[in-house]
Amino acid sequence: LKCKNKVVPFLKCKNKVVPFLCYKMTLKKVTPKIKRG
């Protein structure tokens, strides 16, 4: 996921299927890999 980018995670994830999820994970500073697994 593009969420890995800490610059503008919300904006990048905005075009994805799980924008809110990516946003929350970024706030928690948790890599998407953990949740995806």
Swiss-Prot record:
**Where in the cell is the protein located?**
Secreted
Q: Which UniProt keywords apply?
A: Blood coagulation cascade inhibiting toxin, Disulfide bond, Hemostasis impairing toxin, Secreted, Toxin
| Main location class | secreted
Single GO term (MF): toxin activity
Q: In which tissues is it expressed?
A: Expressed by the venom gland.
Gene Ontology cellular-component terms listed:
extracellular region
Modification note: May contain several disulfide bonds.
Answer yes or no on keyword Endoplasmic reticulum: no
Q: Which family does it belong to?
A: Belongs to the three-finger toxin family. Short-chain subfamily. Type IB cytotoxin sub-subfamily.
Q: State what this protein does.
A: Hemextin B (monomer): does not show anticoagulant activity. Seems only to synergitically enhance hemextin A activity.
Q: How does it assemble?
A: Heterotetramer composed of 2 hemextin A and 2 hemextin B chains; non-covalently linked. Does not exist as a complex in the crude venom.
Q: In its UniProt entry, what is this protein called?
A: Hemextin B
